[in-house]
């Protein structure tokens, strides 16, 4: 009888040790996964920062205080920029930093209509500085794009994005800044670049 109790206690202790070792293994594996994800995100941040620095260093690039970088491809003749709630008709192509196209109204063959307050922060800022007919190449840091979560399955976390954006029209003419006000803001941003 004592012998059965003795072996039962030993078996119970061995099961306990086995159980604890399994829990420790699971914690180590999940810790490794979290550590891997953290390393990947740190890598994405570094690469994204370098991408933005390279784009900002190009001779025709303008960097705004927010970190948004743009290049003018074509200058329009519109008299105003859109206000945050003006409906805008645009053509665009969106790319990841490696050049992969993730969305394009041009490929669909039809412009898109939306308000500046309905899109990512980088677009919101840029559109309010564009006039009808302007076409810009935008380089948007991750914090003005889809942030730490990424977007739509195609855009990883911490991804800077590149967009080729053409503002075709502003419905009802626009209520935003005048062309002169926009030119003054952009002139100041260009002067700040030259001072660096």
From Swiss-Prot:
Known role: Essential virulence factor associated with macrophage infectivity. Exhibits PPIase activity.
Keyword Signal found = yes
Q: Which species is listed as the source?
A: Trypanosoma cruzi
> What domain of life does the UniProt record list for this protein's source?
Eukaryota
EC number(s) on file: 5.2.1.8
Q: What is this protein called?
A: Macrophage infectivity potentiator
Q: Where does the record place the PPIase FKBP-type domain?
A: 85-171
- Principal localisation: secreted
The protein's annotated catalytic reaction(s) are: [protein]-peptidylproline (omega=180) = [protein]-peptidylproline (omega=0)
What family is reported? Answer: Belongs to the FKBP-type PPIase family.
One Pfam entry name: FKBP_C
| Cell compartments where the protein resides | Secreted, Extracellular space
What GO molecular functions are on record for this protein?
A: peptidyl-prolyl cis-trans isomerase activity
Leader sequence residues: 1-29
Q: In its keyword annotation, does this UniProt entry include Isomerase? A: yes
Q: Which GO terms describe its cellular component?
A: extracellular region
Provide the gene name from the record.
Answer: MIP
Provide the alphabetized UniProt keywords.
Isomerase, Rotamase, Secreted, Signal, Virulence
EC top class, in one word?
isomerase
């Amino acid at each position: 009888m004592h012998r059965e109790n003795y072996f039962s206690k030993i078996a119970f202790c061995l099961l306990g040790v086995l159980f604890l070792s399994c829990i420790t293994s699971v914690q180590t594996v999940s810790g490794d996964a979290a550590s891997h994800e953290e390393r990947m995100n740190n890598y994405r941040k570094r690469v994204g920062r370098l991408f933005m620095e390279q784009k900002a260093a190009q001779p025709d690039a303008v960097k705004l205080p927010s970190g948004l970088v743009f290049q003018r491809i074509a200058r329009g003749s519109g008299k105003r920029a859109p206000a945050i709630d003006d409906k805008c008709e645009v053509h665009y192509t969106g790319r990841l930093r490696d050049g992969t196209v993730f969305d394009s109204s041009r490929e669909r063959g039809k412009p898109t209509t939306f308000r500046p307050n309905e899109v990512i922060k980088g677009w919101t800022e840029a559109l309010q500085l564009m006039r009808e007919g302007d076409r810009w190449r935008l380089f948007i840091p991750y914090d003005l794009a889809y942030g730490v979560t990424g977007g739509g399955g195609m855009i990883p976390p911490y991804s800077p994005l590149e967009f080729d954006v053409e503002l075709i029209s502003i419905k009802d003419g626009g209520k935003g800044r005048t062309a002169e006000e926009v030119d003054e803001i952009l002139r100041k941003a260009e002067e700040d670049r030259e001072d660096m």
